[in-house]
Amino acid sequence: MDFNTVSSFQDILMRMSKMQLRSSSEGLNGMVTQFESLKIYRDSLGEAVMRMGDLHYLQNRNGKWREQLGQKFEEIRWLIEEVRHKLKITENSFEQITFMQALQLLLEVEQEMRTFSFQLI
């Protein structure tokens, strides 16, 4: 394929991908926002693991950090189930690819949160 054909094909795929995301359920934006929040929380756990004495720091800063951690795990499990459900009911291949990638990211974030939290406990 020549460069123009490849470029045009990529452009079409991008436009179709954007159209499919807009046509997905309204809850998708909320799911993305929640996912971003969970990624930030995961990053803060990772930073806490790297600093010395952070278990005490976390306990002093937030006496209910274990409860907060439990809530974050509930959130990510809910998001995983939502994405799995949408994946099952979606017939459009572009949406299926998008939801498969989202599911993979969610599972990675959940695993990293578990790893960091076990190191803190």
Swiss-Prot record:
Major localization class: virion
Keyword Transmembrane helix: no
Biological processes per GO annotation: exit of virus from host cell nucleus through nuclear pore
UniProt motif Nuclear export signal: location: 12-21, 85-94
A GO CC annotation given for this chain: host cell nucleus
Domain of life from the UniProt record: Viruses
InterPro entries for this protein: Flu_NS2 (IPR000968)
Keywords, ordered alphabetically: Host nucleus, Host-virus interaction, Transport, Virion
UniProt keyword Metal-binding, yes or no: no
Subcellular location per the Swiss-Prot or TrEMBL entry: Virion; Host nucleus
Family: Belongs to the influenza viruses NEP family.
Job description of the protein: Mediates the nuclear export of encapsidated genomic RNAs (ribonucleoproteins, RNPs). Acts as an adapter between viral RNPs complexes and the nuclear export machinery of the cell. Possesses no intrinsic RNA-binding activity, but includes a C-terminal M1-binding domain. This domain is believed to allow recognition of RNPs bound to the protein M1.
Miscellaneous notes: Average number present in a viral particle is estimated to be 130-200 molecules.
Self-association state and partner proteins as the record states: Interacts with protein M1. May interact with host nucleoporin RAB/HRB and exportin XPO1/CRM1.
Entry protein name: Nuclear export protein
Organism of this sequence: Influenza A virus (strain A/Swine/Wisconsin/1/1961 H1N1)
